[in-house]
Every structure is written in structure tokens, then in C-alpha cells.
A protein has these predicted regions:
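Conserved P-loop NTPase motor cores
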Residues: 1-95
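Conserved P-loop NTPase motor module
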Residues: 101-130
Length: 130
């Protein structure tokens, strides 16, 4: 390929990250090695990783440590009692157990506090007679 044909940014989406980037995955796993490389060097290479998982506490520390933005959906009290959530103020911990579908709490170093966001309902669900 010629340089002009290579995209300047590559976006990778991974669902169920805990299957591939868990603390329990063997250290010699080729998928884990690639994930660590992407999370540790990806930004400088123009690679953006979006990952989703049910339990942040299960994810490898080096993967979590290189994530700038975290979006938290509804979770349970057992999960928020883990050390990964020790920085979360009690009011937000309480919110995390009661979030509705489409509601998230965002954490990013740019913001001084956590943000509660709500995605709008799809247009076809907003009206009874559609």
C-alpha cells in the first residue's frame, strides 16, 4: 500500500473485553499481548480502542491503566465494592446501582468530577403512535 492509502486513525471496537484482556488470561496469550501493545502504544500510532465489559475489576491492570476515558453503566454492589471503584464518591456508587438503560457515568481527566449522561431514547420509541 502507498502511504496515502493508509488511514491516519484506526478505531477498534471490542465487546466483552474481559474474555481477551482479563487478569486471568495467560500472560503468553497472543491476544493479550496485542491488547497491551494497543493500549500502551496505540495513541502514538493513531489507534483508538473502544472496549466494553461487564466488570471493570476483571480487566488486566495495564489495560485499565492506559485508558483515559471510562464510561460506567449500571452495575451491582459487589462490583462497586472492588478496589477499582475506591475513587468513586459514595453518591456516584449509589447511582451506579440504579442507572437506567441509556444512562452512564463518565470519567475523564479533562473533567473535574464524574459526569452523569443520558442518551436520548430512539425517535421511534418517543411517541406512542409512532
Amino acid at each position: 500500500r502507498e502511504e496515502a492509502e493508509i488511514p491516519s486513525k484506526i478505531v477498534i471496537f471490542i465487546d466483552e473485553l474481559n474474555k481477551y484482556g482479563s487478569k486471568d488470561v495467560p500472560k503468553n496469550s497472543p491476544i493479550l499481548r496485542q491488547l497491551l501493545d494497543i493500549t500502551e502504544r496505540g495513541r502514538s500510532l493513531g489507534i483508538i480502542l473502544f472496549a466494553a465489559e461487564q466488570f471493570k475489576s476483571d480487566i488486566h491492570d495495564r489495560v485499565k491503566g492506559n485508558c483515559a476515558t471510562h464510561a460506567y453503566g449500571r452495575t451491582n454492589a459487589i462490583e462497586i465494592s472492588k478496589p477499582d471503584y475506591q475513587f468513586v464518591p459514595p453518591v456516584y456508587k449509589s447511582m451506579l446501582t440504579r442507572l437506567k438503560q441509556g444512562e452512564y457515568i463518565l470519567q475523564n481527566p479533562v473533567f473535574r468530577s464524574l459526569l452523569n449522561i443520558k442518551f436520548p431514547r430512539p425517535l421511534y420509541k418517543q411517541f406512542k403512535n409512532g
